[in-house]
Amino acid sequence: GVLPAVAGDVSCRSSESAGKPVNAIVWQNLALFPWLTVAGNLALPLKLKKEYGIAERVREMLAELELEGLERRFPAALSGGQRQRLALGRALIAKPDVLFMDEPFSALDAVLREHLQHFLKQLRERHPCTMVFVTHDIGEAVYLGQHIMLLGARPSRVAAFGANPNFTDNANVDVRGTDAFYAVQRRLHNAVAAVRAGQELHLTDGA
């Protein structure tokens, strides 16, 4: 993690697995290096790990991100959606075990946000890893979350946790707009309202 744990344990990989787990983060402000080109930003995690075949892996990632032909541009010359895709690609190129995302789509308009939510699902099919996604958008949580954790007011605590019955990891299936999607969205909205009102929620897993 970025900060040392105050209490508790976090397990990543089985006890038989060797090596330190690799974690990556996509920040809310993306934290792209403005003095590096698109290709330079993608290559940096691999250079820090002293990986081989960096140029080829960067080319492959550029194709996945639909950024081919832009590899020599700097982040300031990209559109908002292109910068978002670059940040995701830089995080995934090192093949992390866990990818943390801190509201990466919050500054985007609704249409672009939905496009990138779908794009993230496509990336996850090709780069399977555990993803922890922080959001204040209920619809985004219902669309992306296999499990959803609701945090209470400060000091933060887990107010509720459960499996999302509406979740599918198939990027070709868009559940948004279905009755089942709206049903889960309403339940989550009611849970958020209850927590804000100071009501206690029972921790569940799937209920």
PLM regions and their residue ranges:
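Helical segment within the ABC ATPase nucleotide-binding domain
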Residues: 113-127
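Conserved ABC transporter NBD signature motif
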Residues: 5-20
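Conserved ABC ATPase "signature" region
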Residues: 52-70, 122
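Short helical segment in ABC ATPase nucleotide-binding domains corresponding to the A-loop/adjacent helical element
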Residues: 39-47, 55
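Signature (C-motif/LSGGQ) region and adjacent switch/coupling loops
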Residues: 39, 71-74
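Hydrophobic anchor residue at the start of the ABC signature
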Residues: 26, 88
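Catalytic Walker B motif of ABC-type/P-loop ATPase nucleotide-binding domains
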Residues: 99-102
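Conserved signature/switch motifs of ABC ATPase nucleotide-binding domains
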Residues: 73-76, 94
